[in-house]
Amino acid sequence: MASYKAPGVYVQDVVSGSQSITQASSSVGILIGVTRSGVIGVAQKIGSWTEFITKYANGLDTPFLENSYLPYAVHGFFTNGGKELYIGSIKKAAQKAKATSTTNAITAVASTEGVWGNDIKVTLKKSVDFDESTNKSFDVTIAVGTSDSVTITDVTLETICEAVLTNSKAKEWISEFSLGDSTNQLAEETFALKDGTDGSQLQDSDYVNALSMIDVLDDVTLVAIPGQTSKVINDAILSYCDNNGLFPILDMPLGSTAEETKAYRKSISAFTGALPHPWGKMNDPLTNTLKTVPTAGHVMGVYARTIESRGIHKAPAGVDAVVRGFVEMEYQLTPAQISTLNPIGVVCVTSRPNAGIVLWGARSLNSKDSTMRYVTDGLLNLNIKKSLYDGTQFAVFEPNDESLWSRVQATCKAFLETLRTSGALKGTADEAYYVTVDDTNNTDATIAEGQLNIEIGYAPVKPAEFVIIKLAHSIEAQ
């Protein structure tokens, strides 16, 4: 205790007995696949369907594609209440559309790769104030198909390039715009960009390799590659998610029967994850007809909505788990089929009286560990591990002694108590969790190796059943 001699106000630094742990987000997802345009090979986060259109469809009214389920899945995610989503866009050997006009020798290049750029047309017309001797100004219009365009007025030979490349709308579509060295005056003309390609057909390995985009993301939990249903891809998703603490959502192949789904489900296992079935039908703006699409994106949105609105420990199933955006399902599951699929961990997507289309099943892909039987078990477990791991980073480089152990224990217990009082853990504090960080799991040998070991147990359902989590931090030896 400090000794103070004179009257006054004194400030003293005191090391807190515990640190505050912020609960990690578990509602952020990533969808991987082919988009109309956008950055390729690097996942980018978006917060709305409108932002997807801007970044991955060049602002077009119809961002949907005949050869990709990804845009439909993204639409399903946001329609169902998802808030934050990474897009992992992939293409193989794709080319940007480009052209050099014959009249003005203008070279224009599309902003991103893809056949979409072949719909870009550039038109130069004399402005209303054009005068051959005093005002040689033009209006330049850049259009993408018939659905969207922008007109930049009163440009001249000296200003046209900068005007196009700095226009907020035009630069969504055009990345390069330049005049030939010999161009000394502008003239009216229209020309179209060409030779844009979506690249060669993607192989299973391309989708598997695309999972590496997640390596640099630290806030993703939910993972899906919509409509890609080969065993190679699904096995890779399960393995990647198991190894990286993520929650996979798989799709069955289009047209799969209940029996085929049952057989496939029994052939796989994972720490956690979801296998929804069957596919759903939604209105397709491309054809104005119903299109049958995979359910992974829609289900991901329902999960994200439930986590944010009700809590990570609330099952995303039942009459509250309404699936928005589907007009009907590929086929209606019978009660007998549901009673067969639900117990083995298939999330049945079905229509219920007075509720509409809902998720009627909350069991996960873990068929070996009874403590991870439900979707909520896996999501809560992943959330606790990430929250505690991130929240105990303060311990790194600290002296590995009893004082540190006490602080870490108090920090972890405070976080777990918050979960208990929110309803995520059951029972009294003694029944709901425990934290061990002492000389029983931090021996002289482990301390010499620079390790801090923390063991946490918690009871998500039954107070007598504990799920064990062991964390290890690498700490410089003292």
What are these regions (language model features)?
Residues 81, 167-168, 181:
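Short, flexible helical or helix-coil boundary motifs
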Residues 182-202, 207:
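Long, low-complexity, polar/charged, intrinsically disordered or flexibly structured peripheral segments
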Residues 118-128:
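Broad, structure-driven detector of short, well-ordered beta-strand segments within folded domains
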Residues 147-151:
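Surface-exposed loop/edge segments in extracytoplasmic proteins
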Residues 46, 152-154:
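Conserved aromatic
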Residues 1-117, 130-137, 143-145, 206-478:
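Structured, hydrophobic secondary-structure cores that serve as assembly/anchoring elements
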Residues 166, 173-179, 412:
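Gly/charged, well-structured mid-domain segments that form the phosphate/adenylate-handling core
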